Amino acid sequence: MAESQVERFTFQAEINQLMSLIINTFYSNKEVFLRELISNASDALDKIRYQSLTDASVLESKTELEIKIIPDKTAKTLTLIDSGIGMTKTDMVKNLGTIARSGTKNFMEQLQSGAADISMIGQFGVGFYSAYLVADTVIVHSKNNDDEQYVWESSAGGEFTIALDHTEPLGRGTKIVLHMKEDQLDYLDETKIKNLVKKHSEFIQYPISLLTIKEKEVDEETTAKEGEEESTDAKIEEIEEEKEKKKVKVQEKEWDVLNKTKPLWTRNPSDVTKEEYNSFYKSISNDWEEPLAVKHFSVEGQLEFKAILFVPKKAPFDLFESKKKANNIKLYVKRVFIMDNCADIIPEYLNFVRGIVDSEDLPLNISRETLQQNKILTVIRKNLVKKCIELFNEIAENSEDYKKFYEAFSKNLKLGVHEDSQNREKFADLLRYQTSKSGDELVTLKEYVGRMKEGQNEIYYITGESKKAVENSPFIEGLKKKNLEVIYMCDPIDEYAVQQLKEYDGKKLVSITKEGLKLDETEDEKKKAEQDKAANEELLKQVKDVLGDKVEKVVLSTRLANSPCVLVTSEYGWSANMERIMKAQALRDSSMSSYMSSKKTLELNPDHPIVRDLAKKAAEKSKTFKDFVYLLYETALLTSGFSLDEPSSFASRIHRMIKLGLSIQDDSSATTEESTNTTTSDDIPPLEENDEPSEMEKVD
């Protein structure tokens, strides 16, 4: 082939790094390369078969859909041939080197940190490059119906070549030739290849044939004549020719089909072993680990379909990436593969569930467009959700298994609560939370309701950034004092879930950080509350005057025990935690933010010494009253989970209060600078000083 016909390309940087990592790092389980190449071949066959459902002529170039494996110990090569869709020249450039998949960088990072194993390479969309675990040179011949036959070649030196292929025509499909490394020649052994296919690819639905060399004994006929002359004399004994049979060993090439197993989902579940389920799961998922749980069932009646659903042990790295495929359910119609990314077959919040669905009722030539309006698919979807919930409840019967499941997929369950109104209560049953009484144990909502105090009609919860933040929150003080249990919700997605989960088992869910919290009071407590209100009326008015529009109102609190004050939000607005989450959203709707983060209510604890002394200062018209009010307001923002709009002003205020407490006199320049800093906001005046003794001492 003339050099001018060969085009050279440079690997995209991330691909080059990945190949370098694969080649220069020692991995013990190199055998994954065969699984990955067979999986890619199966995908290519799926694509051409799907095309053939609407255009039978695409198979004319090659009618058989199959995968062939040819080991050659003499040439030290391993060849895989499939009659799939094949690649055009453009496909080769795109798929084999210049464009990295979305997971390439992520995979390399996890591989280097030890968080991922080389066996997980297929999950990241870069399984082809596992060939370099065992080969130093890879040659790919490919023919697509829409292009000429091309050959791709690379020895992983940072570049690859593509040229027109003038070797044996493929008709259609792809042939990959691996030139094996000297220390990897055992992968050319027939027995090893058979074992690997059985282990990883037994349930690939296309025949996988291995070219084997078999020794056979054949008969070699020799004719021996007894007596050197043959006489026709009747008296002479007739000499019979005797055929002496001699065994001779000859070598013959034969194709052995390695995957003769009947499709697993068509068999009776009671006849399928755990090992078969595990093997099938690995073949469809690219997961190296066994599944956590499996559900094998069939639906009969007006609608018929069979399905196997699996729950993985770990969440995939890209579980919530917007560009990942909608789900991992493969759709078959009458044992014919149709597609593996049908968005309507299962809700997006269950996108971690893997498996297959084989329908008897959908038309074979159905397209993605008509599938979206298909009523049969709607019924299948409802059944799959129902069976998934059953499967999750089965996992919950084993606390250790459910702990693993919940750590990996609790966000998906909470999305189910948020999105699925029909099954909201069922998903709520699957939720687990720590509470103010549970320690490190997780409890169900059912368990919480079961141990509610007599007369308690509401489920109390608090949302926050972490368990430590919520268990030390001032909001929880009053409920702890009354021995009321509070649920800790520390996952950002909890905020969305409780927006839809208004009640559980007839009990309303109430946020203890919002208005509307009503705790049972004794007659003495009610009487005291009236007295406190009357005694602090002037204080509440003056605090509101100082803070102005920063708060909607100032009231006395019934939810505080040890803290002087707290800021609560309206019952139907955002909590402080939700406000924090929304501020972190780059594409948030600012108009919605200003509407939902409504005015806050400042609640004061009438029994706290700071508030009592503040009431005296209000009555005395003290010059430092405003300063203390602002400090209380700003510290309440922090302890209630809000962020400060002007942290520098708050810091200046604290510094000045420290100086006041230590009786340190500001020098004029510092005073001027501080004054400039603290008057940047018209709303927050600077600290006012007077000639009285330390005001901090008076507060103490």
Curated annotation (Swiss-Prot):
Comp. bias (Low complexity): 666-683
Annotated keywords: ATP-binding, Chaperone, Cytoplasm, Nucleotide-binding, Stress response
Gene Ontology CC, one term: extracellular matrix
Complexes and interactors: Homodimer.
Keyword Coiled coil: no
GO biological process annotation, one example: regulation of aggregation involved in sorocarp development
Subcellular location: Cytoplasm
Protein family per UniProt: Belongs to the heat shock protein 90 family.
UniProt xrefs under PANTHER family: HEAT SHOCK PROTEIN 90 FAMILY MEMBER (PTHR11528)
Described function: Molecular chaperone that promotes the maturation, structural maintenance and proper regulation of specific target proteins involved for instance in cell cycle control and signal transduction. Undergoes a functional cycle that is linked to its ATPase activity. This cycle probably induces conformational changes in the client proteins, thereby causing their activation. Interacts dynamically with various co-chaperones that modulate its substrate recognition, ATPase cycle and chaperone function.
Name of the protein this chain belongs to: Heat shock cognate 90 kDa protein
Species this chain originates from: Dictyostelium discoideum (Social amoeba)
InterPro entries linked: HATPase_C_sf (IPR036890), Heat_shock_protein_90_CS (IPR019805), HSP90_C (IPR037196), Hsp90_fam (IPR001404), Hsp90_N (IPR020575), Ribosomal_Su5_D2-typ_SF (IPR020568)
Domain notes: The TPR repeat-binding motif mediates interaction with TPR repeat-containing proteins.
GO molecular-function term, one example from the UniProt record: unfolded protein binding
Binding site for ATP: 40, 82, 95, 128, 368
Domain of life: Eukaryota
NCBIfam families in UniProt: PRK05218.1
HAMAP family reported for this sequence: HSP90
Biased composition (Acidic residues): 685-694
Keyword Coiled coil among UniProt keywords: no
Intervals of motif TPR repeat-binding: 696-700
Residue span of region Disordered: 665-700
